[in-house]
Design a protein with these regions (language model features):
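Extended, highly charged segments
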Residues: 1-228
Length: 228
């Protein structure tokens, strides 16, 4: 038998399937099943590669956003991160982080003496959120876009502080030239660090969202305590 005609259960039509005359019907069926499984597995591998590529694109999108507001020390930490992840070849020289006890994050202070810790790259974001911040501090970050983590060192927020912190997060983000930028905020204790991921990522628990028009004038309302 060279072929067999069967019902197509997806659209109700008839379809003709070629057969290999060297084999019986059962063997032909098994051969087609094996081809199906191979194709299915290939699609699974392809989807995994697509997902990995999307992750890489998102990662470099974050890096491109953060480098716009980076100073020399921020940029050197970003270079070190790329070396550690294998994107750049490591050079035989002492890195900035080996000379410092912690990353070079920024500390700002409001008129009410409330401190903001601002990460200017992925390494700093990880540090201020998961090491520097207390569980009762508040975390701010733009929604669904790359940007700085802003930690408010306080367990009690008023409207002024919320808008100020959200303004800093919006300004140091990919949405800095947009309007009505959504900024999520929550207490640090609700955050989790996803396992096996690159630095700078968090998993959100319960959170609130505020909409802010980014403006560099927000920085004029804050005192720069020290560059760390």
């Amino acid at each position: 038998m060279k072929e067999v005609t069967v019902d197509n259960y997806y659209d109700g039509t008839k379809m003709t399937i070629p057969l290999d005359e060297r084999y019986d019907g059962k063997t032909n069926a098994n051969r087609y099943y094996n081809k199906y499984q191979k194709a299915k597995n290939s699609l699974k591998v392809l989807q995994e590669q697509i997902d990995l590529t999307k992750e890489e694109i998102n990662y470099f999108d974050r890096m491109m956003t953060l480098i716009e507001n980076a100073d020399y020390y921020d940029a050197m930490e970003m270079k070190e991160e790329l070396e550690n992840l294998g994107y750049l070849k490591k050079k035989m020289s002492k890195s900035i982080r080996k000379k410092k006890k912690h990353p070079h994050y920024q500390t700002l202070k409001t008129k009410d003496d409330v401190l903001f810790y601002v990460g200017k790259n992925n390494i700093q974001n990880d540090y201020v959120t998961f090491k520097k911040a207390k569980k009762t501090d508040y975390w701010f970050h733009v929604k669904d876009m790359p940007g700085s983590h802003v930690i408010v060192h306080s367990d009690n927020l008023d409207e002024y502080t919320i808008r100020l912190a959200a303004g800093v997060a919006a300004y140091y983000s990919k949405g800095k030239d947009s309007s009505s930028v959504p900024v999520n905020y929550t207490q640090v204790k609700t955050l989790k660090k996803p396992g096996g991921n690159k630095p700078g990522l968090v998993l959100l628990g319960h959170y609130k969202t505020i909409y802010i028009d980014p403006d560099s004038s927000v920085l004029k309302e804050l005192e720069k305590v020290e560059e760390r």
